[in-house]
Amino acid sequence: MWIYILVGIICLLAGLAGGFFIARRYMMSYLKNNPPINEQMLQMMMAQMGQKPSQKKINQMMSAMNKQQEKEKPKKTKK
């Protein structure tokens, strides 16, 4: 009788771990394919703040944001 409970708990833990890693992988690929901010959104935000966005300025801000994301990646993988 106790073996069924033990097997059930082990299966539950394995399912939770598997689900977590599948969901994590899905979200990583989703965010890589669909970044949370793009050039059009950045241009609109700058216009709302009263700045006239030039393409050079937008490219600089996008590259700075990408560098920041790349810098944060190694910190997350070490944990």
UniProtKB/Swiss-Prot annotation:
Main location: membrane
Domain of life of the native organism: Bacteria
Record keywords: Cell membrane, Membrane, Transmembrane, Transmembrane helix
Pfam families in the record: UPF0154
Location(s), subcellular: Cell membrane
Membrane topology value: Single-pass membrane protein
GO CC terms, sorted: plasma membrane
Chain intervals for the UniProt region annotation (Disordered): 57-79
Entry-linked InterPro entries: UPF0154
Transmembrane segments: 2-22
Polar residues: bias regions: 57-66
Signal peptide stretch: none
Family: Belongs to the UPF0154 family.
HAMAP family: UPF0154
Protein name: UPF0154 protein Lm4b_01315
Organism: Listeria monocytogenes serotype 4b (strain CLIP80459)
